[in-house]
Amino acid sequence: MRGLTQRLEAARSYRGAWLRPSNFESFWETSVTFAQNAHVESAVELPSATQAATFKRITFTSTDQTQLRARVILPAGVSVAEPLAPAELPASAKLPAVVLFSDLGRGVRSWLHLLRFSALGLPVVALEARPCEAQLKDAWRGALTAEELARALVNPDDAASSTLKQLIDDALVTAAVASRFLGRTTVTWGEGLGGSQALFAAALLPKEVSVTMALNPLFADNATTLRAHVGCGDTPQSDAAIDAVGLLDSACAAELVRVPALIGTALLDQSAPTEGTFALYNRLPGQKEMRVYPKFGHERINQFENEQINYLCEVISGLCHN
């Protein structure tokens, strides 16, 4: 435990090897524009025995023209957006919707789990993520190291063609579509890959996202993770590779997050090392809180999920009184 304590103390002040590339915002501009113009193409109400909520499944198209699906729960009394002027929005529209992203290889959370948010009066949208490659299907269990994940999803020679780029695009489209469909801002939340998606959405969609939460977010401090491949910035080629992986770095995205953020890290996590998570956390410029779990690895942490509820109640109360 002494070793973990020393590692934690060293990590607390770490900010990562490299800051955000100068072309970060311009790189994502096309994706953001697409997301802000995307819309729900179909919405199907699902049968339910409860009157406490309405269950739907919506479809919409991502940047590569793949049709995505998401689960939607509307608490009783909440409906989809109406063409009202801002001053005419009902009081319930002040409450944001929770947009949930799953970890790599893990399916969408159950309808029952999603009800924990709708019980607070918050609509919920949960992306049904596209299938991943077979060798990545156990990533959510912590079966791959940070370097293995980065090598699989990040192309240092061409960030735009990286698998991770498309997965972040999916998150941007989901958050923007959810905000427009429900007529309110969103809380983006995810674990692992989903945590990175949540943070990128908060960074790049400031009008659509009002709070973000991430547990063990992947792909933070990519230049350190991939140092053997991208080098140390001592040649033009190395500089270019470092910038490329920085475009897909959740710690770089964190520099643009202005909304309240709750971040969690597990000290035994080899997929999302604590050092990278602190690099991300220390670069968040706005209101932020960190939770550290010494005895956990890359896994679901019930204590964090319980603390989420208290955090949401506090933050949303502040949002509604502003």
Kindly give the residue locations of the regions a language model identified.
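C-terminal catalytic histidine-bearing segment of alpha/beta-hydrolase fold enzymes
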Residues: 278-322
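N-terminal targeting or regulatory segments adjacent to alpha/beta-hydrolase or S9 domains
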Residues: 1-53, 79, 84-91, 120, ...
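Hydrolase active-site cap/lid region
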Residues: 195-243, 292, 300-303
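Short beta-strand element of the alpha/beta-hydrolase
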Residues: 92-104
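The serine-hydrolase catalytic nucleophile loop
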Residues: 104-117
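The feature captures the conserved acid-bearing segment of alpha/beta-hydrolase catalytic domains
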Residues: 223-283
